[in-house]
């Protein structure tokens, strides 16, 4: 009988509570607004960044040093905003746009990561090819971010 109970409820109540997000809706909204600024700053500084890891640091996908990009774990902020009915004017559209944003972020990260290993033996591809592709994805993130921001309700 104890084994059956374990199979039905494998997590104790305290573990289930610990998995809930500790981010408040206000903190999630603040993180989102900072992320929009980070995207603009990244695009403005693009030509001065030194390689794929510098791009990935700004994307929040490779955290080097003491500062963390607001884009780091942005999916958690999206979840908090989705779960807070008062934050979004159109839940379905927000969900679709936030997934599209996350996909573009992942593609940008992949291209920036690939730039770190480009230029090997054989017929090498220059790293700039991959950083240029990453930039296209970040520009797409900016476009999607405008759409997401328009769906957020910022005043009561």
Language model regions located:
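Intrinsically disordered, low-complexity segments enriched in small/polar residues
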Residues: 1, 49-50, 118
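N-terminal twin-arginine translocation
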Residues: 2-22
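Domain-wide signal for the mature, well-folded portions of proteins, strongly enriched
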Residues: 5-12, 42, 56, 141
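Small-side-chain structural scaffolding
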Residues: 13-16, 79, 112
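C-terminal amphipathic alpha-helix
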Residues: 25-46, 104-156
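Alpha-helical segments in soluble extracytoplasmic regions
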Residues: 27-90, 94-100, 104-105
């Amino acid at each position: 009988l104890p084994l059956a109970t374990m199979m039905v409820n494998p997590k104790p109540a305290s573990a289930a509570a610990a998995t809930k997000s500790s981010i408040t809706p206000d903190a999630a909204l603040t993180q989102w607004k900072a992320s929009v600024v980070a995207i603009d700053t990244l695009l403005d500084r693009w030509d001065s960044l030194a390689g794929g890891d510098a791009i990935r640091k700004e994307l929040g996908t490779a955290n080097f040093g003491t500062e963390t990009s607001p884009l780091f774990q942005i999916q958690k902020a999206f979840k908090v905003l989705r779960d807070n009915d008062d934050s979004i004017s159109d839940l379905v559209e927000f969900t679709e746009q936030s997934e599209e944003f996350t996909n573009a972020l992942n593609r940008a990260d992949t291209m920036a990561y690939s730039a770190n290993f480009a230029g090997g033996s054989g017929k090498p591809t220059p790293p700039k090819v991959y950083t240029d592709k990453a930039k296209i994805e970040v520009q797409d993130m900016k476009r999607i971010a405008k759409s997401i921001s328009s769906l957020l309700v910022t005043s009561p």
